[in-house]
Curated annotation (Swiss-Prot):
Entry keyword Cytoplasm: yes
The UVR domain, residue ranges: 195-230
Domain of life: Archaea
Protein's name according to its UniProt entry: UvrABC system protein C
Length: 520
């Protein structure tokens, strides 16, 4: 099984995405505690053969932290609808696409509908991929607005009526206009118009209070409190027809760590992460570069204003107005804070792994930039090499490189390693480009010796290690025995993760070349 580092996964609510070697999302899940839930997949005993197969395909895990379980639940629903992962519920199954329906009766009932064709008999809300989400929201609406659920109205009071959770129109306790007002309120909530609903309810509460109908005013007050509580937990999904991008960042040392949330029609659907050197106008530079190849959204939510003219520039690119917003409070500020929280989880748990790796290798400072080499061939033919770069513990794919090996003989991994290391660092020397802080080679002492000899030939005092596949043992130059680093420690797992990525990249390149040669 490929090594997956679980030490960086936070113990917070959120969603996790399992990805295969191509980056395709295999499975999306939610959790109250991400670390516990994700770790459970990698225990020795699994529940089903299907999970065994899923786990064997996992090469990467991405997480998005949320503020609550409800947010995680809604985000999971959005991600499953968008990506339709192979190992999630089959979205063609009508049961997984359940709706909430309010019927067209004079005294409408609320319930579950499993088919869009029933739309003629009422108003549909959804669909909901998660039954838990649907049931939770349905339960809230029933308890808050006391709509009936019975299929046929009788003249006898039901159990819900006795419990005070049904308005009981069947017994004449409520008039049709009064009941329709409750239906309208439920409709507002299910359409995401909770702020409009709260505004109307507050006016109604004030009217009752002014008329000294305090019991009715208290009922409305409790209803407002319940809706506000639900709304505070639903920042991840907001009823909007436009799209938004949320950008937040932090600067550490001379490096900018930036995260971008994609919000499509009110639903958080994905995130992107970036690392780059700090400059005086780094935010402006990022926006200009990113949106030169990506259509700007209707609204860009930021922690600070970019330079003047940026709004007009983005509007010009989009072809319609783009709004730049710097929120100080409210749901947009909450999303900005959520982006920052994910930023810390993504980058600074990685910093902790790097610090531990630096200590384990007795380096003066933690290695910010790590480059790793892997050799791949098919029965000694078509030898290729890959080099992957990790910056601050995260893949830096812009600096990945692929090589066809020219000088090494068939199955001569040592000569192939020497060739690729020499080509890489001779070029960096010619270009006067920065060198990595640490070099990792896939293999044992033999591959390490070949690579280290090239570094000495080039007079490059770069720390270098190797990692052997079977036992996950780490070697350093001049020593035939592996370092005493625990195989499941964050430092060792980070090296394994980097090595696995280099191996994946090399295999992908080799397959591509083989397919090309077959076509020719």
């Amino acid at each position: 099984m490929v090594s997956i580092d679980l030490t960086t996964i936070p113990e917070e609510p959120g969603c996790y995405q399992f990805k295969d070697e191509t980056g395709t999302i295999l499975y999306v899940g939610k959790a109250k505690n991400l670390k516990k839930r994700v770790s459970s997949y990698f225990q020795k005993k699994s529940i089903t053969p299907r999970i065994d197969i899923l786990v064997s395909l996992i090469r990467d895990i991405d997480v998005i932290v949320t503020s609550s379980e409800v947010e995680a639940l809604i985000l999971e629903n959005n991600l499953i609808k968008k990506y339709q992962p192979k190992y999630n519920i089959d979205l063609k199954d009508a049961k997984s696409y359940a709706f909430i329906q309010i019927s067209n009766d004079p005294f409408p009932r609320i319930g579950i509908a499993r088919d869009r064709t029933v739309k003629k008999t009422g108003t549909l809300y959804g669909p909901f991929v998660s039954a838990a989400e649907r049931d939770q929201i349905l339960k809230f609406v029933k308890q808050t607005f006391h709509l009936r659920t019975c299929k046929k109205m009788t003249k006898r009071a039901c159990l819900r009526s006795h419990l005070g959770t049904c308005a009981a129109p069947c017994t004449g306790k409520i008039s049709e206009p009064e009941y329709q007002y409750l239906v309208k309120s439920a409709d507002y909530l299910l359409k995401g118009k909770s702020q409009d609903l709260i505004y109307d309810l507050r006016k109604e509460m004030e009217t009752f209070a002014a008329a000294e109908e305090y019991e009715k005013a208290l009922v409305i007050r409790d209803r407002i409190a319940a809706i506000e509580n639900l709304s505070e937990r639903q920042y991840v999904q907001r009823q909007k027809k436009s799209d938004e991008h949320i950008i937040n960042y932090l600067v550490s040392g001379d490096t900018v760590y930036l995260i971008l949330f994609h919000v499509e029609r009110g639903s958080l659907t994905s995130k992107e992460e970036f690392v780059f050197p700090e400059t005086e106008d780094f935010l402006d530079e990022f926006i200009l570069q990113y949106y030169s190849s990506t259509k700007p959204p209707n609204e860009l939510i930021l922690p600070s204003l970019p330079g003047s003219g940026m709004e007009e520039y983005l509007t010009h690119i989009r072809g319609s107005h783009v709004t730049l917003t710097i929120p100080k409070q409210g749901e947009k500020k909450h999303l900005l804070d959520l982006a920052y929280k994910n930023l810390e989880v993504s980058f600074f748990t990685g910093k902790m792994r790097l610090a531990e790796l630096g200590e384990a290798l007795h380096m003066d400072t933690a290695p910010e930039v790590i480059e790793c080499f892997d050799i791949s061939h098919l029965r000694g033919t078509g030898t290729v090499a890959s080099m992957v770069s990790f910056r601050d513990g995260k893949p830096d794919k812009r600096n990945y490189r692929r090589y066809k090996i020219n000088s090494a003989g068939p199955s001569d991994d040592y000569a192939a390693m020497a060739e690729v290391v020499k080509r890489r660092y001779s070029r960096l020397l010619r270009e006067k480009s920065p060198m990595p802080d640490l070099i990792v080679v896939d293999g044992g002492p033999g591959q390490l010796k070949s690579a280290h000899a090239i570094l000495e030939e080039l007079s490059l005092p770069i720390p270098i290690i190797s990692i052997a596949k079977r036992e996950e043992e780490i070697y350093i130059p001049g020593r035939n025995t592996p370092l005493s680093i625990q195989k499941k420690s964050p430092a060792s797992l980070l090296i394994q993760e980097i090595r696995d990525e280099a191996h994946r990249f090399a295999i992908t390149y080799q397959k591509k070349l083989r397919q090309k040669s077959i076509k020719e």
